[in-house]
Amino acid sequence: VQIPGVDRLRKRLSKREIIYLIAPSGHPNYGDELIARAWLRHLARARPRAMVVLDCHSPGQAALMLHTEHPNVVFTDTLWQMAGYAANTDRADGPDPTTPWIWVAQAATTFGKAPRLAEGVDVFRRASSVHLLGGGYVNQVWPHHVSLMVAAAQLARTTGVPAYATGQGLIPMLTGSYGSALTDAAAEFTVFDVRDDASSKALAGVAGTRQTGDDAWLGVEDALAAAPAVDSSPRRDGVTLCLQSDLTDDFTAFGTTGLDALTRFVRATLDEWQVPGEAITVIEGIPGADNEIPTRLGDRLAGARTVPFLDVWHSGLPVGRGDTWISTRFHPHLVAAAAGDSGVAVIPRPDYYATKHRSLTAIGSLWTVVDDPDTIPARPHAGGFSASERDRAVAAKKELAQQIYPRRWF
């Protein structure tokens, strides 16, 4: 006996939904992992039965960090392998590295171009949707990543499935043929969401463009809830440092550049504020890389506490303690300011980080953004975001997540 309703449900269940996510996860980097975790947790609530594919450049480490966040998540690097291969200028043959996105779009959506990755291509071709998670990884800093976006657009174009991009930071904007490839691809997306005004202006006229801020807002409430408990009598002079060593070549202060300049600036700031070493906490946003400046500071940090990335990831970012932050990294600024902490945002690379940090002050962060590293900023006491500003940012991102992935039980 055939029961039409049951038969329809059985047929629907037999065609399992595949949600295909693309993200720079697994390096690891606090912000990138926070964003991936936030979306996986949302999907665990909204689409618990779906197969979720996270295509990222370091799937092994990403799997170790994120495999518990959704019951059916799998990790691969299909598109990231293709993007890296096509952009490689050391090859004597193969795709044209000056237009790598052309080959990647073809290889990702048709069999034969990348036979070793056929299993991954098969999964990508069967995806029910494709989604570039937020971050600042498709821009002039990493131009070859435009291939990821073009591949997603090609899937949408050839199969009709929706393509989404959320919380994108496109500044510094790609130029020339790379810029054209990006805007042409963006036009194929059902939703193309950006995190800052400059990125929105760069896509002026592209249908489907919206602006709801950084994707980390989707996970801020969890990040604040996971923060280590505050001591009953925290230090009133505490300072937390999160200082990168990558992308610092353009930083200039006191007649020096790069890491030397950043080290001198931080030392001078700590001295001006009269912060003793034992009042300082050092945070790793990227493991290893964020210990370079603290190591250079040497005895100036005598007695300081260091929180390695592993502890940050498993035990939470130590925010809400009343410390004043000095951070070059963007997502520690976002989370600490969301907790109400005061801070100074230092811009290590102006064409990239200025837009990022100022996207937060534009929506209410009261942090000081350093414009002139030769001038030591006064220690701020104004706090970060107000509760209403934080809640507004969280609500906007949650609303977008609900629109893209409404709750479904089958």
Regions found by a protein language model. Give the residues of each.
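Active-site anion-handling motifs in enzyme catalytic cores
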Residues: V1-F410
